[in-house]
Design a protein with these regions (language model features):
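Flexible nucleotide-binding loop
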Residues: 95
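Acetyl-CoA-dependent GNAT
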Residues: 3-91, 99-104, 108, 112, ...
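C-terminal "cap" of GNAT-fold acetyltransferases
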Residues: 10-12, 115-161
Length: 161
């Protein structure tokens, strides 16, 4: 069975994104429970601001009836957008779903005439970092920090469109 990509945005879809982040990042990377709460809070803040609006979106990767991945795009201002909430369950990795999700965001950002995209991640997510660099994102800063109960290298990436 192949992974399909669809646009989302319902409350149910947003809840799926939060659940995915809790499962993957707590289970695989040992992030504290506060990470899941932060994801839920961030998505709630975006929704209160009218997200997803024109030039923004949420896309889900599905395997059968199960949501196995997600990505978001939101407008920051000044021609800049933010790619966020990229996550894939282990069963979807290696299928090309991550690349397809990122390409969906790039397509939407270009169609909305964004000038630049930004994203934040941490260095343990090496496959994601490789994917971002392969489509042209550049690491503009790295900071050693403690977040969600773990020491990590927090990375900021940008892409000129």
């Amino acid at each position: 069975m192949s992974v399909s990509i669809r646009a989302g945005g319902s409350s149910r879809d947003v809840n799926s994104v939060v659940r995915l982040h809790r499962r993957v990042y707590a289970g695989e990377y040992g992030l504290a429970r506060s990470f899941g709460r932060d994801v839920a809070r961030r998505l709630a803040e975006l929704r209160r601001g009218g997200w997803p609006g024109p030039g923004e979106g949420l896309w889900l990767a599905e395997l059968g009836d199960s949501v196995v991945g997600s990505i978001t795009l939101n407008r920051v201002g000044g021609g800049m957008g933010r790619l966020g909430h990229l996550v894939l369950m282990p069963e979807a990795r290696g299928s090309g779903a991550g690349r397809r999700l990122v390409e969906q965001v790039l397509e939407a950002a270009r169609a909305a005439a964004y000038e630049r995209l930004e994203l934040a991640t941490f260095s343990d997510l090496s496959a994601a970092g490789s994917l971002y660099r392969s489509v042209g994102f550049v690491n503009v800063s790295t900071e050693r920090t403690v977040r969600w109960g773990r020491r990590m290298e927090w990375q900021l990436y940008e892409l000129e469109l």
